[in-house]
Amino acid sequence: MDVEQPRTIGQRLREIRYWRGKSLRVVAELAGISESYLSRLERGERQVDSRSLLEALAAALEVAPTELTGAHELTSAKGMGEAHAAVVALRVALADNELDDPADDTGRPWSELAATLHRVNSELRPAADYAGMGLVLPGLITDLHAVATGKPVHRHDALVGLLDVYAAAGFVAKHLGEPDLASVAALHARAVAAQLDSPAHSALAEFLRAQAVSSPARPRSLALAARAADRVAPCVGSDPGAAEMYGMLHLTCALNTAALRRPAESADHQAEAADVAARVGSGINFGHQGFGLVNYGFWEVHLAVERGEGGKVRELARGIDTRGVASASRRAAFYTDLGRGLATERAYRQEAVAALRTAERLAPQRVRANPFAREIVTDLMRRARRDAVSRELRGMAYRMGLAAS
């Protein structure tokens, strides 16, 4: 199997810089990095390995971060063509349905809808099966709207179900490089939550909104998450769901401030989330967000990588037992972050490959669509050309559409 030259973030960066007619010096100054570092990024000698760097470069070039990650070019990765194709029907469903104004007012029997909703929450979403969710969610959105409108006996359950499916829709859209669609799903979720009269559900909707706008508008995401955390704070002691969302909102604030290069603020938000996680323990999995001690540990690794502290992840990961986490997607995210951190240390690059391979086995679509995982695999392939390229690394590159047989 021969290795082909993949389109990396660095290559897209150079192409867009030329298209903009901007010099290395101008873009480097706008992004807050040195000219030599930018040159090495463009040549593939260094990785774009954090949100803060990716978003700074995108802002300097006046493009969306997805233009640099090439999210719309992922159809060559194994299984991703079907996932992207399914987004079309999802977009139509989000456009055609409004609260109390469904696109189709007939709907399916509630028992059938409840079974489909259970499948989304217990199988498709935890597996990060974007293609599977793309096939199921459009019809489910329309049918749940019909039930919420025309069947008062099931209205509350249908509204809670709509929050779940809008969360799933936003998850699919965001990870497939459709941030506008994720924002539409989050706004729908907000309208639904307003009907539930529940601080925890309102906090969940605001969390989804902050997540949806995070990459294109990091300061706005921070403001939304911080405001929502303040609003739900009075309920933390009496409502377990509110406590979990309070923790998730502070973790979102920690990530946003890390991406904005404000490490002290990030650490403060992380400490607040840690305190809540210690009280929550295993949690009740409110909103299928999984907040608790183990998930906090996952986020601790994630935040360390984002702050450029990849050397810490090996030690941080030692105390984390992933076996109790039902969501394969969440475990895959952890192993991806572990691989990202380990890859920064030459001595641990084989461990990085093993971590990424574990992540891919758990949630293949999520990992193959992850721009940072793709960057790491590309970089490791480049570094390995002088030596024997491991079978695992070569296989991952092929399945990501980064290498040809």
List each language-model region with its residue ranges.
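Short C-terminal boundary/hinge segments that cap the last helix of small helical domains
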Residues: 62-77, 296
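Short, charged recognition helix plus adjacent turn
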Residues: 70-99
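Short alpha-helical DNA-recognition segment
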Residues: 21-41
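Conserved binding/catalytic microenvironments
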Residues: 3-5, 105, 110, 114-405
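A short, Lys/Arg-rich alpha-helix, primarily the initiator
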Residues: 1-20
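DNA major-groove recognition helix of helix-turn-helix/homeodomain DNA-binding modules
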Residues: 32, 52-67
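The alpha-helix within a helix-turn-helix
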Residues: 17, 28, 58
